[in-house]
């Protein structure tokens, strides 16, 4: 399958869809400077159209990453404060690297299929992952197209699911999923009580329904 880049005359941006139906690469953007309104509008449009966007070759400080992230809205501060920058708690470090026998970041973060912060009353609008060091191919970060997962179901199943809700519990099976981590403290548990969400959510910008499980 050949992907045709979409060029935007007003900016230097090109959007190149991935061969699969999920994801696109954005070219011609340097995130060291906060993008202007027109440039960000193209970035946001690409995200809405393709679900996942990639901007390769960036060289960012944590502060620059946070500044770009604020283009999408107010940043969340995670209820677990390990491995964050003291002056920038909105940015968490995930890593399998150890220094002096200690992990320099969260290990095995999100090793099961999940949607970030689904356990909060207002789930995350978007997650930004800045890869500092990664293998040339493969690796463990994967994405699932939940628009397609819903659309590919039989009509009767789609109709049934649209009437159902599910409980999202941050603390459910935590110790089983993360046996190498200390158990959650009572304070951490209290910060994220179980919440309910529809099994099918409609994206506020695109109007497209997606499974949310």
Show which residues each predicted segment covers.
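Non-heme Fe(II) oxygenase catalytic core, chiefly the N-lobe of the double-stranded beta-helix
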Residues: 2-213
């Amino acid at each position: 399958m050949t992907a045709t880049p979409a060029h935007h005359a007003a900016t230097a941006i090109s959007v190149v869809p991935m061969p699969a139906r999920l994801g696109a690469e954005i070219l011609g953007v340097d995130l060291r400077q906060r993008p202007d309104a027109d440039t960000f509008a193209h970035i946001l449009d690409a995200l809405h159209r393709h679900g996942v966007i990639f901007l390769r070759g960036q060289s960012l400080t944590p502060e620059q990453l946070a500044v770009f992230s604020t283009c999408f809205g107010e940043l969340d501060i995670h209820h677990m404060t390990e491995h964050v920058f003291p002056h920038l708690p909105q940015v968490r470090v995930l890593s399998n690297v150890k220094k002096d026998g200690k992990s320099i970041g969260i290990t095995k973060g999100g090793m099961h299929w999940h949607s970030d912060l689904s356990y909060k009353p207002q789930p995350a609008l978007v997650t930004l992952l800045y890869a500092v060091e990664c293998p040339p191919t493969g690796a463990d970060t994967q994405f699932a197209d939940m628009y397609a997962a819903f659309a590919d179901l039989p009509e009767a199943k789609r109709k049934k699911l649209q009437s159902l809700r599910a409980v999202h519990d941050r603390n459910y099976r935590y110790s089983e999923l993360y046996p190498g981590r200390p158990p959650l403290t009572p304070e951490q548990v209290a910060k994220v009580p179980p919440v309910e969400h529809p099994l099918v959510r409609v994206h506020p910008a695109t109007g497209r329904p997606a499974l949310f499980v």
